Amino acid sequence: MDPLTLEYLQEQYIKIQLLKKSEKSEVWLVYDTDGNLAVMKTIYNTGLPIKLLKDNPSRFWPKIHLLHEDKDQKYTLVIEEFIQGKTLEAFINDRKITPSKGVTLFKEFCRGLKDLHALGIIHRDIKPSNIVIKEDGSPVLVDFDSARLASSDRGKTSDTVLLGTKGYAPPEQFGYATTDVRSDIYALGVTFDKVLPADSPFMLKKIVRKCRAFDPDNRYQNADEILRALSYARLIKILGGLLLLAIPALLLIKFVLFPMSAKPTEEQKHEQKYSTQQNEEKVQPAAKESGPTKEEKNQTSAETTHSTQQDEKKS
């Protein structure tokens, strides 16, 4: 028997549990010859960019142990790392993702997607059930059955094969135009719209909404743009928090340097009124001493007139 036939390769592993079976593939949890857990995938398709994943290992996708492609029989056999953890879908259903953890996952996933797109690969089936959260909290993207190399000829051709999952796949993935990295951006937005809580900050909602734009030109053009937008949103949040802290501090400084005069009590008002009356009484005598009164002026005038008359008689 040819050592590279599908049957021979499959016999090198002990099947434990069927994980998934469809028209596109069959996936088994297996033991290898050393007794280690692994995932065996028989994909009824060829030309997938899985060799690029094998040659460029990353924590964002499973490590590929073995890859065999038979173009005549039109199948690809993949033995890959078994990822210990729970799917993002399970976390969403259990409602065990806090808002801060959701944002952290969003950022980490964008970093991983940036690495994937740097290889020229688009996944085309990003959804919560295809994201496994490891025990250390990091996300891993699985199921590359629909993956392909991104086309550099944007918008001039359309995908002839309808792939992906309804509700997560963008419009262009259903024959409107060719798919590219922005198609993964769309699915990413739909996914994390389900992860992040409804009361998330406005700027975070705005980022997710832009990811999901109908027109690819209106979306973020790559994962790096999303990371910059998330960093900006965090900066605005920090500055807003500092402003809220600064307002009470500024008010305190104002009251210390420029204290407001207290409203006088009734007793203080009475004392102030009494003091004013006393001052008025002191001013009145002083006014009398300052010059002759009207009666004194009249008497002086009369004496002056009488004296003048006496002088005239003598003369």
Predicted features and spans:
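ATP-binding glycine-rich loop module of kinase domains
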Residues: 12-51
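Short beta-strand micro-motifs within the conserved protein kinase catalytic domain, predominantly
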Residues: 63-76
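Conserved short submotifs of the Hanks-type protein kinase catalytic core
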Residues: 73-87
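AlphaC helix of the protein kinase catalytic domain
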Residues: 87-97
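Activation segment signature within eukaryotic-like protein kinase domains
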Residues: 105-106
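Catalytic-loop of the protein kinase fold
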Residues: 113, 117-133
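Conserved activation segment of eukaryotic-like protein kinases, specifically the C-terminal portion
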Residues: 157-172
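Conserved HRD-motif arginine in the catalytic loop of eukaryotic-like protein kinases
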Residues: 219
